Amino acid sequence: MLPFRSNIAAMAGYVPGYQPPDVASWIKLNTNENPYPPSPEVVKAILAELGGDGALLRTYPSASSQVLRETVGELFGFDPAWIIMANGSDEVLNNLIRAFAGEGEEIGYVHPSYSYYATLAEIQGARVRTFGLTDDLRIAGFPGRYEGKLFFLTTPNSPLGFAFPLAYIEELATRCAGVLVVDEAYADFADGDALDLVRRHENVVVTRTLSKSYSLAGMRLGFAVARPAVIAALDKIRDHYNLDRLAQAACVASLRDQTYFAGCTRLIRETREWFSAEIRTLGYEVIPSQGNFVFAAPPDRDGKRVYDGLYSRKILVRHFSDPLLAHGMRISIGTREEMEATLAALKEIG
C-alpha cells in the first residue's frame, strides 16, 4: 500500500461543475462562465506574443508578472507591492491556507458558499469550521472574537447570489483575530466591493478572478490585494512561474479594455434582472443576485426534477445535493437568447 498522508487518503476531493465534451451543442449555464468572448484585444495580444513563429515560448515568462501587477494597480489604485498575480484566484486561496494555517489549526467559512475552501484546508491538514446563515443573510453564531487563522467570506455569495453589506464585512474584519479573506470572484457584477478595506485593515485580503467578468476562465488568471507583508509571504510560496506568457499578455490586454468589459457586465446584469423577474412570474423563488447567476427554486421545491428536465433539453445548470440547496438550482446568466430558451424550457417543464 502506498504511503499517502492520512488526510489525503481520507478526503473526498472537490467536484467541479460538469464540462460536456460536446459543449457547443449545449446551453451551458452551470459554471458561471461569461457567455461573451473576451475582448478582441486579448486575441491580438496573444498573437503578438507568439510573434509568428512562437519563438518566445521557449523562454520562461516574467516570474513576478510585474507588468500585470502594475496594470492591476493602476486600475484599482494600489501600489504593485500590494498585489500578487495567480493562476486563478484558487491559487491565492490555496497559498493563503499554506501561509497561515498549519496542521490542526482552524479556518472558517460560511456554508453554503465555495466548498473548495474545505478541500484546500483538508490538504493542509487544517481544521474546518463552518457557519450558517440567518434569515436576514448574516452569519449565524459568529463569535465576538473569531480565533481561527483564516475566515473566508464569499461575497457575492455563490451559489446564493446575495452580497454582504460593506459595513458588515468591516465589522467581521474587526472580529477576526486572524485574516479575513474576502473572495470577490463575482464583485464585478455587484453594486460595490470591499477593496478599500485592505487600506483600513491589515488583516483583510481581497481575491479576484478574471474567469467570470473578463471571459478568461480558460486561461486561469486571478489576483489578490493585501498589505505588502502578506503579499511578500504569499510570494515566497507560489510557483515562481505561475503565469505563462500568453496568460500574462491576455490579462494585460483584457484589463486595459475597460470599455468592452463594462459593456459585457452591463449586458449580464440586465439579463440577470430580466430573467429573475420572468421566472418569478412562474412561481419561482429567486434570491436577488449580485453575481452572474441566480439561485432559483421552483414552486414545488424540487430542484432535481427541474434540473433533469433542463438536462434532457441540453440545458445545463447546477444542482446541489446538499439539503440546504437541493430545493433549487444555480443558473448562470447566458446571452439573452440562451436565457429566453431556458425560460421557454422552464415553462414546458412546469
Curated annotation (Swiss-Prot):
GO terms for molecular function: histidinol-phosphate transaminase activity; pyridoxal phosphate binding. Its cofactor is pyridoxal 5'-phosphate. It catalyses: L-histidinol phosphate + 2-oxoglutarate = 3-(imidazol-4-yl)-2-oxopropyl phosphate + L-glutamate. GO terms for biological process: L-histidine biosynthetic process. Its EC number is 2.6.1.9. Pathway: Amino-acid biosynthesis; L-histidine biosynthesis; L-histidine from 5-phospho-alpha-D-ribose 1-diphosphate: step 7/9. Keywords: Amino-acid biosynthesis, Aminotransferase, Histidine biosynthesis, Pyridoxal phosphate, Transferase. It comes from the Bacteria. Pfam families: Aminotran_1_2. InterPro entries: Aminotrans_II_pyridoxalP_BS, Aminotransferase_I/II_large, HisP_aminotrans, PyrdxlP-dep_Trfase, PyrdxlP-dep_Trfase_major, PyrdxlP-dep_Trfase_small. The modification N6-(pyridoxal phosphate)lysine is found at residue 212. The keyword Transferase applies. NCBIfam families: hisC (TIGR01141). Belongs to the class-II pyridoxal-phosphate-dependent aminotransferase family. Histidinol-phosphate aminotransferase subfamily. Homodimer. This is Histidinol-phosphate aminotransferase. It comes from Geobacter sulfurreducens (strain ATCC 51573 / DSM 12127 / PCA).
